[in-house]
Swiss-Prot record:
Descriptive protein name: Probable glycine dehydrogenase (decarboxylating) subunit 2
Organism: Thermotoga petrophila (strain ATCC BAA-488 / DSM 13995 / JCM 10881 / RKU-1)
Phylogenetic placement of the source organism: Bacteria, Thermotogati, Thermotogota, Thermotogae, Thermotogales
Keywords: Oxidoreductase, Pyridoxal phosphate
The reaction(s) this protein catalyses: N(6)-[(R)-lipoyl]-L-lysyl-[glycine-cleavage complex H protein] + glycine + H(+) = N(6)-[(R)-S(8)-aminomethyldihydrolipoyl]-L-lysyl-[glycine-cleavage complex H protein] + CO2
Role played: The glycine cleavage system catalyzes the degradation of glycine. The P protein binds the alpha-amino group of glycine through its pyridoxal phosphate cofactor; CO(2) is released and the remaining methylamine moiety is then transferred to the lipoamide cofactor of the H protein.
Length: 474
């Protein structure tokens, strides 16, 4: 039931007090011809409606959320408390810089900490998400070569295991995307060697990659990329695996984007809010978006980089997310962040060892923070697909993994338990997944018609795609 269906004419949740300010009528050209179709509900109606929806929803506060490549870790409530402090909550981006020195200091110090973590020289906090960070990075790449008069570089190389946003971001900027083949789940260095030429502007990599494998040839890849005059771009989606262990800048990357909403523990999902800062090495600092924050004596001020690509987001990005990430970093400290990565890798390998007993692991061996299993054998022998397995998992009150990604693995299940789950939770999740796989052989129709216990049963995704309904009509 929607909030509109609870509506009863004349029902009110509150009424405004009488005002001694004289009434003023807007010119007719600004007025609606008909009243807006807003629901008329009481306060209990509203509270019960949204409480009911919240109970039907699932979040990391309710249980494990092992979406691969999403880092759905538990988000400490302290972060929310700090972001809700009046000094952060009540400010406005149009205020003079001298009246928001605390906020500017926070942004400056956050930049400094993120640069130290990644090995970059400067950073912008403007981008609102990871893909937005990619787009910003690609704009910097384009402007960098344009400023050098090197306009023949039209290609960006992307591995076949990459996030789909990588080729999309490069294409949006006008680059031609060329795919690099994988060998044993990692970049095929020989194939990369064939593709690198004077037309290549950048190579985009995720390390660890989307299979949860560390690109062991990264130093060689960086050397090859730079020898041909191209830039090396780091998709920071999987930084949670290597904090305190290795830095993208030390691997040879020129540009890096981060996902503060993932690695640095701020709530995300359903489209946001996110934050995708972009860090660069010295030769690219002047191309960062404006405004940037710098320290001038005892004060913090805004400035415009000399060769800036311009704004990429209104004002200063998603500022509350920056506050939460800043809080998380200070709370964890250097040793704590390193421990985060150690536990993320340990949990992933423990869970993989459990799951490999009943599902195939195409690229087996030591993984980093996540791993990819395959239900291809299950599908061949039972007709049950990965999608059916994911839907059935919902009946056990937990969230399924990412499915059908990366594309180079058939019937893929991409699993990232994160560092915040304990052994008991991992054991229970493996037990549920094993039970579901067993059901696929014993009673496949149970999976093909799942879920059975959720408020909404299986949605007709084809119909939803072809005939979407975006608004309510009574």
């Amino acid at each position: 039931m929607t909030i509109f269906e609870r509506s009863k004419k004349g029902r009110k949740a509150f009424r405004l007090p009488e005002s001694d300010i004289p009434e003023y009528s807007l010119p007719n050209r600004f007025l609606r011809r008909t009243p807006p179709e807003l629901p008329e509900v009481s306060e209990p109606d509203v509270v019960r409606h949204y409480t009911d929806l919240a109970r039907k929803n699932y979040s990391v506060d309710r249980g494990i959320y092992p979406l691969g490549s999403c880092t759905m870790k538990y988000n400490p409530k302290l972060n929310e408390k700090v972001a809700n402090l009046e000094g952060f909550r009540e400010i406005h981006p149009y205020q003079p810089a001298e009246t928001v020195q605390g906020s500017l200091r926070l942004m400056y110090e956050l930049k400094e900490m993120l640069c130290e973590i990644t090995g970059m020289d400067d950073m912008t906090l403007q981008p609102a998400a990871g893909a937005h960070g990619e787009l910003t990075g690609m704009l910097i790449v384009r402007e960098y070569f344009k400023s050098r008069g090197d306009t023949g570089r039209k290609k960006v190389l992307v591995p076949d295991s990459a996030h789909g946003t990588n080729p999309a971001s490069a294409s949006m900027v006008g680059f031609e995307v060329v795919e690099i083949k994988s060998k044993n789940g990692m970049v095929d260095v020989e194939d990369l060697k064939k593709l690198l030429d004077e037309e290549v502007a950048a190579v985009m990599l995720t390390n660890p990659n989307t299979l949860g494998l560390f690109e062991k040839d990264i130093l060689k890849i960086a050397e090859m990329t730079h020898e041909c005059g191209a830039l090396l771009y780091y998709d920071g989606a999987n930084l949670n695996a290597v904090m305190g262990k290795v830095r993208p800048g030390d691997m040879g990357f020129d540009i890096v984007h981060l996902n503060l909403h993932k690695t640095f523990s701020t709530p995300h999902g359903m489209g946001g809010p996110g934050s995708g800062p972009v860090g660069v090495k010295k030769h690219l600092v002047d191309f960062l978006p404006f405004p940037q924050v710098r320290k001038n004596g005892e004060l913090y001020e805004l400035f415009v980089p000399e060769k800036t690509i311009g704004r990429v987001r209104s004002f200063f990005g998603n500022f509350p997310v920056l506050v939460k990430a800043y809080t998380y970093i200070l709370t964890m400290g250097r040793d704590g962040l390193e421990r985060v990565s150690e536990m993320a890798v340990l949990n992933a390998n423990y869970l993989k060892k459990k799951i490999e007993k009943f599902l195939e692991i195409p690229y087996n061996g030591f993984c980093m923070h996540e791993f990819v299993a395959s239900a291809e054998k299950v599908f061949r022998e039972t007709g049950v697909r990965t999608l059916d397995i994911a839907k059935r998992i919902l009946d056990f009150g937990v969230h399924p993994p990412t499915v059908y990604f990366p594309l180079i693995v058939l019937e893929a299940l991409m699993i990232e338990p994160t560092e915040t789950e304990n052994k008991e939770t991992l054991d229970k999740y493996a037990e549920i997944l094993e039970r579901v796989v067993k059901e696929a052989y014993e009673n496949p129709d149970v999976l093909k018609n799942a879920p059975h216990n959720t408020p909404v049963r299986r949605v007709d995704e084809v119909l939803a795609s072809k005939k979407p309904v975006f608004r309510w009509r009574g």
